[in-house]
């Protein structure tokens, strides 16, 4: 938030708000898709975000005073990485609406409505023999200069490998791009321009197998590493006073939200121990055993009637993208269990599927969870063959 006292972030496919120094998170959105990549407007009244509905990634606008959500795009493309301009009048974002290629756009936003989307990056055939990317250059992760005149973007222009380096350009259609820092980045780079305009923070795996946070001057130069360790640190965002950087890390296991003090190395984890939900919820407890009742390690997939997947708050959810959209709306989400797991879900009907390698038959159950109710489910796996 603009006052630096709270964060808006994505968790469990919804947007949440949490005051720093507390452990209470309040849910802001609850829709039929997955909501993520929020960005709060400079006046603190609006949140632009991405909603994945199973067929497209569309930009949405949340009115924080009313909770109303309004669609900004409806082009059935991949629209992502939305960022407010410093004056709150425009949004920069990435879209595949032109020829299915990744380009940076700007859109005017006034009184909760979007208008006049413009593609500002140039469609360019690089002629390069790229191994896993198109010959056409792509443009990702725009971030605004504090004066609102320029954008810094990630592009693979002149690169064969990786998502590319960092480039600056005026926030106008067809403007030339100036290289700032040449590096073989990944999609996790996600740079953010500092409020004073002198620095850019980003994530990189430079010289290591882990993504860490790095700091560079906005006009180029050698970067400085900010975080160290056998973990990943990604998605950095400056606070408005430039005294803190919020980021995502798997330090300690599961992904979680952290805040790094600037300057310095002090950091702390933001924990949501208490959650205030928008809709009625219940508790689902699942026990996985063999036929003798002994707890078993297994893979668990829990799918709601709307096709979304659910997992315990302490579990790392994985996504299996090998699916047929004519059969299901979203990817199959799953987590691993040592035998017992408990999660909070919106009231409704769920399909629980449990697998354990090729030796055991798949266990499937349908269960209804009522508001404020507790539902316990035991699935005993049948061993078909001993390999």
Predicted feature descriptions by range:
Residues 3-5, 43-45, 87-89, 147-149, ...:
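Short coil/turn segments that connect the beta-strands within blades of beta-propeller domains
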Residues 291-324:
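Short, ordered, surface-exposed loop/turn motifs in non-cytosolic proteins
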Residues 282-290, 300, 350, 379:
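A short, amphipathic beta-strand motif
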Residues 300, 326-328, 332-333, 347-357:
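A short, solvent-exposed beta-strand micro-motif common in secreted/extracellular proteins
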Residues 268-277, 367-386:
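Extracellular beta-sheet/turn segments enriched in Thr/Pro/Gly and aliphatic residues
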Residues 334-345, 357-376:
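Structured interaction patches on ligand/partner-binding surfaces of diverse proteins
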Residues 8-16, 20, 29-35, 48-61, ...:
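A flexible loop/linker signature enriched in serine peptidases of the S9 family
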């Amino acid at each position: 938030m603009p006052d630096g006292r709270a964060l808006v972030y994505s968790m469990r496919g919804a947007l949440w708000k949490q005051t720093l120094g507390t452990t209470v998170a309040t849910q802001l959105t609850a829709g039929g898709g997955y909501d993520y990549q929020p960005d709060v407007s400079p006046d603190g009244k609006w949140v632009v975000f991405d909603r994945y509905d199973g067929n497209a990634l569309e930009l949405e606008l949340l009115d924080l005073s009313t909770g109303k959500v309004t669609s900004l795009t409806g082009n059935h493309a991949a629209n992502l990485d939305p960022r407010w301009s410093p004056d709150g009048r425009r949004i920069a974002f990435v879209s595949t609406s032109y020829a299915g290629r990744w380009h940076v756009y700007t859109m005017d936003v006034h009184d909760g409505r979007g208008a006049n989307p413009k593609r500002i990056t140039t469609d360019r055939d690089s002629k390069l023999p790229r191994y896993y990317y198109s010959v056409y250059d792509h443009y990702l992760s725009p971030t605004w200069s504090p004066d609102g005149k320029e954008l810094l973007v990630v592009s693979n222009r002149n690169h064969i490998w990786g998502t590319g380096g960092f480039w600056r350009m005026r926030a106008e259609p067809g403007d030339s791009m100036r290289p700032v820092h040449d590096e073989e980045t990944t999609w996790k780079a996600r740079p953010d321009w500092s409020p004073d305009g002198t620095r850019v923070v980003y994530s990189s795996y430079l010289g290591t197998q882990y993504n860490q946070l790095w700091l560079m001057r906005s006009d180029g130069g050698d970067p400085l590493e900010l975080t160290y360790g056998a973990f990943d640190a990604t998605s950095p965002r400056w606070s408005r006073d430039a005294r803190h950087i919020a980021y995502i890390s798997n330090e300690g296991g599961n992904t979680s939200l952290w805040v790094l003090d600037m300057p310095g190395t002090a950091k702390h984890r933001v924990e949501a121990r208490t959650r205030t939900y928008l809709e009625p919820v219940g508790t689902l407890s699942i026990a996985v055993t063999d036929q003798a009742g002994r707890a078993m390690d297994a893979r668990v997939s829990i799918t709601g009637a709307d096709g979304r997947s659910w997992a315990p708050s302490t579990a790392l959810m994985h996504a299996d993208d090998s699916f047929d959209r004519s059969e299901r709306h979203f990817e199959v989400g799953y987590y691993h269990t040592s035998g017992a797991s408990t999660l909070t879900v919106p009231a409704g009907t769920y399909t629980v599927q449990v697998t354990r390698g090729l030796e055991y038959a798949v266990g499937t159950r349908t269960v209804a969870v009522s508001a404020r109710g507790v539902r316990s489910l035991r699935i005993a796996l049948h061993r078909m063959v001993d390999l």
